[in-house]
Amino acid sequence: MAIYDFGNIEKKWQERWQENKAFSIIERDRPKYYVLEMFPYPSGKIHMGHVRNYSIGDVVARFKRMKGYNVLHPMGWDSFGLPAENAAIKHGIHPDHWTKENVKEMKEQLDALGLSYDWDREVSTCTPEYYKWTQWLFLQFYHKGLAYKKESQVNWCPSCETVLANEQVVNGGCDRCDSSVGKKNLNQWYFKITDYAEALLEDIKLLDGWPEKVKTMQQNWIGKSHGAEIDFPIENTSKELKVFTTRPDTIYGATYMVLAPEHPYVMELVKETEYEEAVVAFRNKLQHMSDIERTSTEIEKEGIFIGKYCINPVSNEKIPIYIANYVLADYGTGAIMAVPAHDQRDLDFARKYDITVTPVIRPIDESDGFDIEKEAYTDSGIMINSEKFNGLDSEKAYEDIAKHIETLNAGKRTINYRLRDWLLSRQRYWGTPIPIIYCDDCGIVPVREEELPVKLPVDVTFSGKGSSPLETSEGFLNTNCPSCGKMAKRETDTMDTFVDSSWYFLRYTDANNEQLPFSKEAANYWVPVDQYIGGVEHAILHLLYSRFFTKVMKDLGLTDQPEPFKKLLTQGMVLKDGAKMSKSKGNVVSPEEIIQKYGADTARLFVLFAAPPERDLEWSDQGVEGSYRFLNRVWRLAEEFIDNNLFMSTSLGEALTKRDKDLKYTIHYTIKKVTSDVEDRFNFNTAISAVMELINELYKYKETDPSKLNGDLFREGIETSILLLAPFAPHFTEELWEKLGKAESVHMTNWPEYDHEAIIKDEVEIVMQVNGKVKDRMMVPTNVSKEELESLAMKNEKIIQIIEGKQIIKIIAVPKKLVNIVIK
């Protein structure tokens, strides 16, 4: 008997798949199925999270092929990003070389897992062949008015003299040199995603195949709220402070105004006043805090009075203007109408700085003991201290006061969104160059489409200091204006890498198109992606940006599809010792070591069997050993079957014994269960468990009475087990399938169909209970009636002994399940 030599088997089949381009065949006469895992950043090494993510997608792809679908299952590389640039600074390795070496290494590791990718469609976002079309799409956005430039704040390291991304700011310091990070105003490029806020929100209802958690996160991120925009005139100036509030009914209780310290009016209002020095110091203090820190519920709310007042437009009362650490300039209008009686944060601030608190809503039932001295009242109620609106229900007063504000020309009812425009400028080298030219005469001029791609230059200096490395390349920086022909300068910012990943799934549909990013025909055929798989950490940015891009491209006429992903699976993390695997924790398990010791199929089987895909998976060495033992058990059974010609024993043409029928039932019940588990629920763990039970039954069947073994039935059991395991353990099953004399690949073989008649049992086990406690079990005909079941129960010897001399209250009979006799 041949041993399970996984090393040679896996190498053999990987080479054969590659030679035959086994997964590149496209057959348009079949229904399409597009399965996609989020493409990785090429760090150089895959980790167990990758193994799990890609194994899940591969099971789906292989299953759908066997079910007769025309499957698209591509892979590529999200290959722009900071690590490559940091490697250039630290080790003097050019990002392009560093990235290509990592891609090569990771591709070999993915192939070693036996993943069924169509490598003919491979994309890498850092290649000119790809980023040409990213630039082309930017130009389409620009011409549509969706790409624009404005001044905004960025993180600035004074030591490195460079801009830092948010993820490079660690505890207020630079991740390179630990210097305190400040803020700096720069002109930056944005995408106008807010133009699509309503469409992005409204179409969440189309995402039936997405987890509710992810849909809720997107809804909250977009953050639609109804309210009023109100203008508060600043005393003794011609300026007004514009605020948005969801509670116009509380405007009479507004006793102070809070501005973000970075609000454009602040420095102008305090200029050459006694408050200027304190305001500057306060602003400088906040320079070293992230937006997340400033808005945290844990942080103490701090502020200072700036010496100015504004006028409440409905009461004409003067209210003081403060700046505070918890108000952000780019959220809302950067100004808040503070109503301390009805907002706990405002109340805490008012108490700290001794600001007036004016309740304008009281509880409907005044006997409920509510005390404004203890907490803010945030519910609806009866209006008070609100002039002509006193006595009204606050919910009705909401509309009345909003109308009153409009009558006074002091504001309007409106809808606000939490969503902000997408800042895409990065002062980096290793990203897609923004295809814009600056001319002293013509201003901002887009690069002509025929001149794309604007390629990244090689002659740059990676010092880690100053502005973008692109500014160090004279050949890149200096160019001619496309409009007037005079000398001009190129944009030296590159795009946020989320831009690259917002449309890659469309490029896969037509990856080698040199005329367009993709043809409309290909996009409409393949998109939406039928099943998208990736981590929940991408629930907002990547998924929202991809939805935005798809909607814009629909409006541009590039595709007819409004949404990119039909179904979404967010897989859980791989843990060890209860924590996410990381080098710092010393709990990393290397996929390469597992593959070398047990084989790729064992690694795949374990990560698919150990937990449902959407849950976290706890690594277990014993679990890996168990998966390896199971594959060896299947191997021995199949080898024994082949070596001993067991299938020659008898024929299915002969009458089946009860033992035969039981095995046939198990075979076809397993087909039904595995099909349902994989197709409908992605319950891969229970699917594998069902195959394990079938293997147990085949062993029992073989060993009980070998002389009366039905060879054809046993062969059916062996072949079914191999087919059902094929998506999970692809090399293993290919080898056994070939050993069984099959000419066609197991992965191109039709998925087995279960026989409805075979899973109808002649007999069923009934549980016998007395007063709800199990006393016996018995086999009865499947079609026995309720009355017959009661009669059989009353004739059961154990039951007769228990109920003798007792009063029978009632008999509960449930056909095919149980009989419960209630006595006293």
UniProtKB/Swiss-Prot annotation:
Chain's gene name: leuS
Enzyme class label: ligase
Keyword field contains Ligase: yes
Keywords attached to this entry: Aminoacyl-tRNA synthetase, ATP-binding, Cytoplasm, Ligase, Nucleotide-binding, Protein biosynthesis
Motif ('HIGH' region): 40-50
Protein known as: Leucine--tRNA ligase
Gene Ontology process terms (BP): leucyl-tRNA aminoacylation
Lineage: Bacteria, Bacillati, Bacillota, Clostridia, Peptostreptococcales
Localization of this protein: Cytoplasm
GO MF, one example: leucine-tRNA ligase activity
Gene3D superfamilies, alphabetized: 3.10.20.590, HUPs (3.40.50.620), Isoleucyl-tRNA Synthetase, Domain 1 (1.10.730.10)
EC number(s) stated in the UniProt entry for this protein: 6.1.1.4
Species this protein is from: Alkaliphilus metalliredigens (strain QYMF)
Similarity comment: Belongs to the class-I aminoacyl-tRNA synthetase family.
NCBIfam families: leuS_bact (TIGR00396)
Motif 'KMSKS' region: chain residues: 580-584
Enzymatic reactions: tRNA(Leu) + L-leucine + ATP = L-leucyl-tRNA(Leu) + AMP + diphosphate
InterPro entries in the record: aa-tRNA-synth_I_CS, aa-tRNA-synth_Ia, Leu-tRNA-ligase, Leu_tRNA-synth_edit, M/V/L/I-tRNA-synth_anticd-bd, Methionyl/Leucyl_tRNA_Synth, Rossmann-like_a/b/a_fold, tRNAsynth_Ia_anticodon-bd
A GO cellular component entry from the record: cytosol
Positions that bind ATP: 583
Keyword Membrane (UniProt): no
